[in-house]
Amino acid sequence: MIIIISGLHGTGKSTIGKLLADYYKLEYYSTGQAFRDLAQKKNMSLEEFTLFVEEHPEIDYELDKLVLKYAKKGNIVIDSQLGAHLLKSSVNVKILLTCPLKTRIKRIVERDTSNFEEKLKETLLREKSELDRFKKLYNIDLRNEQIINELYDIIIDTESLSIQQVLKKIILELEKKF
């Protein structure tokens, strides 16, 4: 089984992805974590690394190759913005988590114990950079509602749901499909 979980920063995709992987006894891979790890290796903040990656598309290509590599192995939950676009029909289920910006930033601040304004600025920069890079590199528009509705099997707004409620909704949907 291959499950792709996508969503903007702070929607809950990493938390839910890890819980799904545990529940179904699957591996878990996160491109977001790989991105953060690369930033740390280069001794850069996420903002600095985001700007660096804009000038070095090979980093995005390398991260996307890893998604394809892990997907080929199977039995995995992949947390990736582009995973559903890159893998399309070779995935069992594609999940998109959504949530309004203010709630997402509050979650990120709680997770990282940081400042709201700082995380808002960083997140907006990262998301704009990702949208621009993915459009330029792959001609993918992550905001296209028609493509979103056609591509994803499950779309959940996580704003007013607990982690357990989101997990339960996804598991119920997966049980209907399999």
Regions found by a protein language model. Give the residues of each.
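Hydrophobic positions on the alpha1 helix immediately C-terminal to the Walker A/P-loop
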Residues: 16
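Small-molecule kinase domains that catalyze NTP-dependent phosphoryl transfer to phosphate-bearing small molecules
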Residues: 116-169
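Post-Walker A helix-loop "phosphate-sensing" segment adjacent to the P-loop in P-loop NTPases
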Residues: 22-29
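P-loop (Walker A) phosphate-binding loop of NTP-binding proteins
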Residues: 8
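ATP-dependent small-molecule kinase phosphotransfer cores
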Residues: 31-87, 101-102, 113-118, 124, ...
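Hydrophobic anchor at the beta1->P-loop junction of P-loop NTPases
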Residues: 5
